Amino acid sequence: MTRLLIAASGTGGHLFPALAVADALDGHCQVSWLGVPDRLETELVPARFKLITVNAGGLQGRGITKLVQLIRLLAASITVRRLIRTHQIDAVFTTGGYIAAPAILGARWCGVPAVLHESNAIPGRVTRLLGRFCSAVAVGLPVAAGRIPGCRPVLTGTPVRSGFLNAQPLPDWVPSGAGPLLVVMGGSQGAIGLNRMVRAVLPELLEQGCRVVHLTGSNDPDVGELQHPRLVECRFSDDIPGLLQHADLAISRAGAGSLSELAVCGTPSILVPFPQAADQHQDANAACAAELGGAVIVHQHPPGHPALGNSIKRLLGARLGDTDSRPELLEQMRAGMDELAQRDADAQLARLLADLVR
């Protein structure tokens, strides 16, 4: 049986696509997982796969700071090389981020094929620097292909969890009624700014009959301040596939993972890119959906600014009784999201890995 090392760490945007690929390979590979101590993978991975952790970080800074980081990278790469040899690893798969650097270098050192998946429209620094050392590079969005020097990436899309690909019921805790369903995903990064934008426009929408599920993320101090029978606030939910499949409209950050989930569910979206994202990659991700007509981009703004409220009213107006609005807008956006979606990304990546180790 093929022995595969998956290197994915840190955020759901790196972990969930890797888990989807692992599911697609189920029964065909013996999977070991390379991660970093005290990150999300320590919660999600050990129940399913053997997790091995190394200390890995970025290469920011100058002088002594960068020297220390380079030494740490070398040490991590040596550890990965030893791991590959000890466990007789046949191939390495990584979804980028800090852990990708020692994984790719260790694989190169051992002559083992490495596959790198880049989900963002603007590739990360590790992808740009080390993509040329991989046996294959896959991208989630077409525009990324020309931004990775020294290699010829293949477009696969970004894998999503299986629940997003199968029809799901609307959770029974969602507010009932005939009004449109608005789902807000604050996200794990920078949720407070987006959440405050949304809360400023919710009272009017709720009074007009809109039903709202607001997933705030874990760092929002204002949870519970707004109360209404058609509003449910929660920090996280395991029912996101069902929520997105039944939502009339979603408001979300524009991380590549969230964008892929919205696309496969065909959910019309207002995307609010995280303004501090590296290289403004969320702006570029959002543009990919907007160019196909699947999303509207609203940049983060103070709560009193009218941009978000105006966009919601324009898109949901027909459902809220505005006779001057265009009811076909949401269906056109669903078609745009459907065009963006790549529903077999996990299977494509599984085939790519299988072909490399034959």
From Swiss-Prot:
Record-listed E.C. numbers: 2.4.1.227
Q: Which GO terms describe its cellular component?
A: plasma membrane
Its pathway, per UniProt, is: Cell wall biogenesis; peptidoglycan biosynthesis
Q: Does the keyword Cytoplasm apply?
A: no
Q: What function is annotated for this protein?
A: Cell wall formation. Catalyzes the transfer of a GlcNAc subunit on undecaprenyl-pyrophosphoryl-MurNAc-pentapeptide (lipid intermediate I) to form undecaprenyl-pyrophosphoryl-MurNAc-(pentapeptide)GlcNAc (lipid intermediate II).
Q: Which UniProt keywords apply?
A: Cell cycle, Cell division, Cell inner membrane, Cell membrane, Cell shape, Cell wall biogenesis/degradation, Glycosyltransferase, Membrane, Peptidoglycan synthesis, Transferase
Tell me the InterPro entries matching this sequence. GlcNAc_MurG, Glyco_trans_28_C, GlycoTrans_28_N
The protein's name: UDP-N-acetylglucosamine--N-acetylmuramyl-(pentapeptide) pyrophosphoryl-undecaprenol N-acetylglucosamine transferase
Among Pfam families, the record links this protein to: Glyco_tran_28_C, Glyco_transf_28
Extract the PANTHER family matched here.
GLYCOSYLTRANSFERASE, UDP-N-ACETYLGLUCOSAMINE--N-ACETYLMURAMYL-(PENTAPEPTIDE) PYROPHOSPHORYL-UNDECAPRENOL N-ACETYLGLUCOSAMINE TRANSFERASE 1
Q: Which domain of life is it from?
A: Bacteria
Record gene name:
murG
| Species in which this protein is naturally found | Synechococcus sp. (strain CC9902)
* Membrane association type: Peripheral membrane protein
Please state which protein family the record places this protein in: Belongs to the glycosyltransferase 28 family. MurG subfamily.
Which GO terms of the molecular function aspect are on file? UDP-N-acetyl-D-glucosamine:N-acetylmuramoyl-L-alanyl-D-glutamyl-meso-2,6-diaminopimelyl-D-alanyl-D-alanine-diphosphoundecaprenol 4-beta-N-acetylglucosaminlytransferase activity; undecaprenyldiphospho-muramoylpentapeptide beta-N-acetylglucosaminyltransferase activity
